[in-house]
Amino acid sequence: MEKTSYVMTSSYEIEKQLINREWTEDQIGNEYRKHPSLRYLHSSHNFETGMTGVAFEDTTTKEIIIGYAGTNTTNDAWNDIRTDVVDIFAGAGGHYQSAFDFYEEVKNRYGDRITTVTGHSLGGNYAQMVAIEYNIPNGVVYNSAPLYLGTTELVKGGMNLYNASRQPYLAHIHTKDIQKLLVVENKINNYTGDMVRIRSKDDILNVGSEVGLGYS
C-alpha cells in the first residue's frame, strides 16, 4: 500500500511539471525526490485527454508500478472535468485509449514487468480499466471514479424498453452504449487479478456507484 500511495501522490506532482514544462523527463528522473525502494522510470501527459501516467520500478523485485493522476482542478482542469462529465457520467469511455497507450509505451520500453496499477479519482478509473484490459495482477485505487456512471442503468432500461416494444429507433439510440456496457462487463467478469479499492464515503462519484449507477 505504501508504494502505491507514493506512486499515486507522485503522479500529481509530476503532472504539474509536465503541464507547465518546468522540467524535462531527464530532470524529473534526476531531481525528483527519492524513494528508498522505488526508481522513477517514465512519465507522460496527454494534453488532449488530460491523462498523466507515471511509471516506477521496485528496485528489489524489478517489478513496475504504473500510476495515473486524477482530476486536477488547477493545472489541466478543463480536460479532466470534461473527461469526468462526458466519459464517465455519460459512459462514453473515450479517454481510455491514452491510458492504454501509456501502458503499452512503458511495456515496450521496459519489458513485460508491469504488475501493479494505481490511481486516485479519475486516475483510479484509468487504473481499473487498464487492469481489466491487460489483466494486470494487482491494482490499488483510491476514491476511484467508477468505470461507468449514470448511463449504465439508462442503457439497461433502454434495452428492456426495446425488447418490450421492438421499435427499431430505440435500438439505434442505445446500441453503441449497450455494446460498450457489455464489453466492460465481460472484461470485469474475466479479470483474474486482485483489485483493492480504498474510498471515503463522501466522494461524489463513489456515492453514485454505491447506489447502483456504476462499476468501480
Regions found by a protein language model. Give the residues of each.
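Serine hydrolase/lipase
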Residues: 60-63, 132, 136-216
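Gly/Ala-rich beta-loop-alpha elbow adjacent to hydrolase catalytic centers
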Residues: 118-123, 127
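A conserved cap/lid and substrate-binding interface adjacent to the catalytic center
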Residues: 6-118, 134-138, 145-157
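Generic recognition of flexible, low-complexity loop/linker segments
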Residues: 53, 126-129
